[in-house]
């Protein structure tokens, strides 16, 4: 789960992480009143969408940039009016863009140094890792690819938490000196406390800045939370903005289906994440384009299969479905019954390729063959992928 930047600032304030004040607004008039109440000499107006690259983005109404620094309340109102209820297109949104329903009015600060700082889970080392760089405000992937020596990493023992020397080590590596060291070590320590307390999978600050009046603060932030731990954080769940998410992913979540939408035209329903990724790979290998990742898990019911089919066929780009099931815990006869019922319930209009293997596979194949539905059977994954690709050509 992701949250907006203005919500990230609220969490920073809660955990004592220094950050310029920022308040969300839903109308241009509300934005102007917010700026008036703040009473600053300059403001930054930011479109609130779950996507990076806002500053270089373009609105479909022709307005350039999702981040603007302005010097008056009147300018705040004008810029907010051009952003709100308009679609912002960035390198991360794709051509469809994202509708801006909120903007944030924040304190504009003058900078003399920008750094990159993040905490995330290192799955290989099974512990959190701090990733930092003196080259902030940039695409960190580009920095890592072209100047890997500029990336600083510090692994944290989860049993001990971040130790004072580790926070200081990062601050020194970011080339901070004097009074800035104390501020930076406090900020780094508090961000780690936030990371663990809220079950985050990522807290990214880009940039972490030093202002001209010698303040160390988090200027922009991105949060990801562990969905499996959200039940412990109802206050975080309240921050969820489903309008920013793929509606198919939201719908799939209601039925415990793991779904991620893609841009292809072959819908996939598979049991097991590894098999799902292998299925997507082999579709690509044979010249096709998968439309999604969908893992129904190991205990799919007829209702789950029906809902999965309904979600897959709601994508107008999908021209064929490929079902790839390995029956271990899940029996092939049960999944076959679910496929038949689902195909009848939603009145399937597109080619359906089914590959079954495993427990009760022969019974499952007979159920499909006797169903009267135009199912395209496949005996192995190669054959299934080739038939699915052929069906959309």
UniProtKB/Swiss-Prot annotation:
Its EC number is 6.2.1.5. Pathway: Carbohydrate metabolism; tricarboxylic acid cycle; succinate from succinyl-CoA (ligase route): step 1/1. It catalyses: succinate + ATP + CoA = succinyl-CoA + ADP + phosphate; GTP + succinate + CoA = succinyl-CoA + GDP + phosphate. Substrate binds at residues 271, 328-330. Keywords: ATP-binding, Ligase, Magnesium, Metal-binding, Nucleotide-binding, Tricarboxylic acid cycle. Coiled coil: none annotated. It holds the Pfam family Ligase_CoA. Residues 9-251 form the ATP-grasp domain. GO terms for molecular function: ATP binding; magnesium ion binding; succinate-CoA ligase (ADP-forming) activity; succinate-CoA ligase (GDP-forming) activity. It comes from the Bacteria. Transmembrane segments: none annotated. GO terms for biological process: succinyl-CoA metabolic process; tricarboxylic acid cycle. Binds 1 Mg(2+) ion per subunit. ATP binds at residues 46, 53-55, 109, 114. InterPro entries: ATP-grasp, ATP-grasp_succ-CoA_synth-type, ATP_grasp_subdomain_1, Succ-CoA_synthase_bsu_CS, SUCC_ACL_C, Succ_CoA_ligase-like_bsu, Succinyl-CoA_synth-like. Its cofactor is Mg(2+). Mg(2+) binds at residues 206, 220. GO terms for cellular component: succinate-CoA ligase complex. Belongs to the succinate/malate CoA ligase beta subunit family. Heterotetramer of two alpha and two beta subunits. Succinyl-CoA synthetase functions in the citric acid cycle (TCA), coupling the hydrolysis of succinyl-CoA to the synthesis of either ATP or GTP and thus represents the only step of substrate-level phosphorylation in the TCA. The beta subunit provides nucleotide specificity of the enzyme and binds the substrate succinate, while the binding sites for coenzyme A and phosphate are found in the alpha subunit. This is Succinate--CoA ligase [ADP-forming] subunit beta. It comes from Akkermansia muciniphila (strain ATCC BAA-835 / DSM 22959 / JCM 33894 / BCRC 81048 / CCUG 64013 / CIP 107961 / Muc). The lineage of its organism: Bacteria, Pseudomonadati, Verrucomicrobiota, Verrucomicrobiia, Verrucomicrobiales.
